[in-house]
C-alpha cells in the first residue's frame, strides 16, 4: 500500500508580498518579547499569543480559559483574542513585519552570480552603492541626453569629477529651457552651477536631481525603492529576445558571451517559473514561528534567547524609528540614513556573515542569522534533518565476549531494562502481573523478580543494533540478539571486531533498539552479525580470526615427532579423545585413526575404509570436528586441494606405522593465511549462516587450546645476537669512505645521503635475514610461534627487539642517515631515543590529519553517488566496456590482473578464443571458473557490462553492476550501490599515505604524488601537482624530436601532413621516440595527465580508463584491493553531464548543463519532431563540484555552498522530485532503496525463517 503521508516533491521559489501576508497570522508591531514580571508574551510583540497561538494547550493568556479543554478547540478568547488550540501551532504559525521602506534580499544582491545586478545589467559594486544610499541611479532618461537610463551617479572620489560635469551640462540645459534670468529656479540653478564648478564646495545631489527632473521628466532614485522601480520595468520576453540577438553576434569576446549567457539563464528561469524580478525586493518580511527561536529560562532567573530574536528586534526598532523620522519631516540625509540602517538590519537577519561588518553579540561574535542556521555541520540540514539523535539508545565501553555466538551481543542488565522498559511493561500487563502502567513501573523500581523474567522473554524477539563511531562502511552498524550479562560493559563477539574496527582498549559502542515490526525483520534478515562474513569492498572474508584464535589452532594442528603416544592406532574418534584426555598421548603426537571411524562423505572408497588408517594427530581430529561432513578433511596446509592432498596420509594396515612416521616429513601447522582460505572456501560451499556456525566452533577451539598451549613471552625468549657488531664495523668504514668522497666534491649532498641510507638498509636487511634463520631453528620459541602463525608481530619487530632499530624518519618524513644501532633488548641511548621519537610524533600527527581528510573524502563520495540504486534487472545497453589487465606501463608490472577485473561481472557479448570456440555467451555472470577459462584461452581483453555504459535514466541495472561482493550473489533490486561504492573507496582512505614522494632532484625521475593527495587530485579533477604530462592533441606519427639542452620539441605529423609541435619542460622524461605512432590523448612525456585536457583531446572513454587505472594504482600500491565497479560508479557520476554549446531549435539554453540521459531524450524528441537538435560538449566535474550540479536542490544545499545553491534553485523555481536518498531522509520519507523500494514482505518472511533457526 502506498504511504499517503509520503511527500512526492518539494518546490522552492521567491515569495511575493501577498504570499508572505497569506502565511502570516498577524503583524508584529513591537520589539518586545516577554514581560519581565509576568513572563507572559507581550501584546503585538515577537511572541504574541494572539499571532502565534497559545503557549499552553487550550489556554488563553488572560486566564479566562484556564483548564485545558479540547472541546474549546478553534474558539477565540473574547477578552484577549487568543485562539484556543494546541501549543504545537507555535512551531508552525508565522507572523510578518510591514516595512516602511522596501529592502533588497541580500542573497539576490550579494551571492554570486549577483542576480539583481545581472537582471539590470549593472556592476555588482555599483548596485550595492545604490542600495546602501551612496549613489543615485537614473530611473527614467526623460528628455535630457547627458544621463542614460540605469546610469549610476557615482560620487566616489575617483569619478565624482565626471558626475559634476554631467550635472553642470544638465543644469545648463535647464537654464536654457526656463529662459528667464529672474525665475527663482534659474537663480537656484546658477547657485548649483557655482557649487558644482568649485570642487572644494559641497553640493546637494538631491537638489540637483530634483531640479533636473522638474524640467526634463528624467527620474532619479536611490536605495532599494529605486532598484524595485527598475525591476518592475523589466520585460522578461523582450530581454530574452534581445540577448539571443546579441549572442548571434560573433564579434563578442568569450567574457562578454559568458556574461550574456548568465543573464539569459536568469531571465529564462524567471519566465519559466512565472516569477517577477521585483519580488527580490521585499516590502514585507516573514517572522518565523516563536518555538523555532525560543526564549529559555536558565537557573537563577536569567534568560537566554535565540539570536534571531535580537535580529528581528533590531528590524522592528529601526522600522518604527524610520516611521517617526518620516512623520517629523526630517532632512533627506537623516531619512536616507535610517533607510540604510533598516536595509542593513534586514541583511543581518537573512545573512549576517555576508555583511562587511556583521552584527555582533555581547561576546563579540557575529549573531547567527537565518543562513547560518541552515548551513554548515551545525546547520539545520546536517544537524537536524540528515541525522537526528535517537531515542531507545544506550552507550557503554565494550569488552570481549568469548562465550557469545556470532549473532549475539552481551547487554548489561541495567542497560537492557532501561532500553526495553516499554516492552517489559507491556509484557507484565499482558501476562496479568500488573494491572496498569503505574503498577508495572513500580515493579521495575522495586526490582521485582518478575521484571527479569519479562526482560528475558522480551529480548528473545528483539535484536539490537550495535554501532561504533566512526561508521566508515555499512558493517559499522550490525544487529545482534541481546544476551543479558553482569557488569556495565557491552560484550562483543571477538570475530566481529574487524568489521567495526574495534579493540578492547576503552572503545565505546552505541546500542539502538529497532521498534517496528519491519525494522525488526530487516535487522534480523539483513543486518545480523552472523551474516556479515564478507567485506563489501573486495568480497574477501572480513571475519578472519586473529591473535589467540590463530595461536590455538596453530598449536592444535602442529605435528611433533617422538612425542608421547606416537604410533598408536585408534579404531574410533572417542577412543583417541579418551586416550588424550587421560594423558596417554600428546596433542601433537603422530597417530593413526582407522578410516572407518571417519565420515563416509570425506572418505568414500569402501575398500580403503576397511583396510586403511589416516596418519594424523589428536589436534587435527579436534580441528576437523568443526567442519561439516561434506567439507574435505584438512590434514595439511594445502587447502585448495585438500581432498586430493589428504590421500598421501592414508596407509594400509599392513604398513608398520612406526616406519611410516620415521619416513614422513612433519607437516606445517595451519596458519592465519590458511584459516582465511578455509573460511572463504567454506563460505562458497555452505553460505553465510553455516560459516558463522563453523567460525564459532573455530573460535572456541582457538581460545581453548591457546590457553592450554601456555604460550607466553619472557626476556629469555629473546635470544642475544652479538654478530651484528661485525656488520656495524664494516658499514662504518663504508660510510666514512662515502663521506670522504663527498668532502672531495665527487658526490652531491643528495647522492651522499642516498648512498649512506643504502649502506644501512643493507645492514639491517642482513641482520634481519640472519635473525629469521636463528628464530626458525627453535620452532618452540613462543616468539617464533606467534610470528610464524600470523597471530602477532613479524620478523621486523623481532629485529628491533634483538638486532637494531635501523633508520628512522625525521619530522618531514624523510629518512635520517644516522641509524639506531641498539636494539630494544639492550636499550637505546638518550640520543637514539630522541631520534626515534621524531618519526613517531610525525606518525601521530599524520594519522590525525589523515582521519579528517579521509572522512571528508568519504562524505563527498557519498554525496556524489548517493542517488545510484539498482532499479531493474536489465537495461539492454547498446555498448559494453572493454577491460584488460591494468598495467603500469612505466615499470611494466601488473597492477590489477584481468581475472580480478572479470570475476563477478556479466559479459556484454559472446566471447570466443582464437579457434572460434565459444568460451562464454553474452549476459553470462563470470565466476572464477569462467574467468580462468578466458585467461587460459589467451584472451587479453574482454567487453563486459559496466555501470559506465548502463542505459538506465536513473540508477543502474543488475546486469551492469554484477555481483554483490558482500553476499557473493547477484545484486538485489533496491541495493543502494552508490553509497556502498562511496564507503568502499572512503573506508580504506585512512590507510593511504599522506606523503608526496620526492626523489631529491635526481635527474630522470619525476616527483609523484601518491596516497590520499593523489586520490583527491584525481577525484576533485584539479591540475596535478608536480610534473604534468604533455598529451598529444592529434593522431599521427612522431617525425622528429629536437633536443635543445634538455628541452625537447616533439614534432607529430598527422594524416593530412600537418605538423603539430610540442615543447617540453627542462629535463622531461619522454614516453615516445622518433617513428612512434601516437593517438590523440596519449602521453608524450612522463607525469600526471590533466583530466580536462584528456577529455578534450582523448574523449570520455580515455578519461574513464585513466581515472580507473590511477585510482587502482594508488590503492593496490598500499595493498588495498577495491573492486573496479565502485570506482566506475564514482566516474559515472563525474562524467554524466554535458554542456549545451548550441541549443538548435530546442528549449535548452546555450551554456546550460544537463545530464547525458536528459540530453539524449531532448535530441530524440527533436529528431521525432524533425527540428534541429541541440549540440553539446562532454563535461567532467570533480566530486566537490558534482553534488552541487545535482538535479536535487535539497541534496546540493545540504552539501556545501548552501546560500548559492538555494539562490539558484529559487530563481529557477526548482522542483525536487525526491529521487535520491538524502532528500527523502530530510523529509522523513522512507528512502527509495532496499525495502523502501521493494517492500518488506520478502524480508519479513526471511526474518521469520531465521528466527526459527539458531544461525
UniProtKB/Swiss-Prot annotation:
The RNAP catalytic core consists of 2 alpha, 1 beta, 1 beta' and 1 omega subunit. When a sigma factor is associated with the core the holoenzyme is formed, which can initiate transcription. Binds 1 Mg(2+) ion per subunit. Binds 2 Zn(2+) ions per subunit. Signal peptide: none annotated. Zn(2+) 1 binds at residues 60, 62, 77, 80. Mg(2+) binds at residues 503, 505, 507. Pfam families: RNA_pol_Rpb1_1, RNA_pol_Rpb1_2, RNA_pol_Rpb1_3, RNA_pol_Rpb1_4, RNA_pol_Rpb1_5. One of its GO terms (molecular function) is DNA-directed RNA polymerase activity. This is DNA-directed RNA polymerase subunit beta'. It comes from Mycoplasma capricolum subsp. capricolum (strain California kid / ATCC 27343 / NCTC 10154). InterPro entries: DNA-dir_RpoC_beta_prime, DNA-dir_RpoC_beta_prime_bact, RNA_pol_asu, RNA_pol_N, RNA_pol_Rpb1_1, RNA_pol_Rpb1_3, RNA_pol_Rpb1_3_sf, RNA_pol_Rpb1_4. It is an enzyme of class 2 (transferase). DNA-dependent RNA polymerase catalyzes the transcription of DNA into RNA using the four ribonucleoside triphosphates as substrates. Its cofactor is Mg(2+); Zn(2+). Belongs to the RNA polymerase beta' chain family. GO terms for biological process: DNA-templated transcription. Zn(2+) 2 binds at residues 875, 950, 957, 960. CDD domains: RNAP_beta'_C, RNAP_beta'_N.
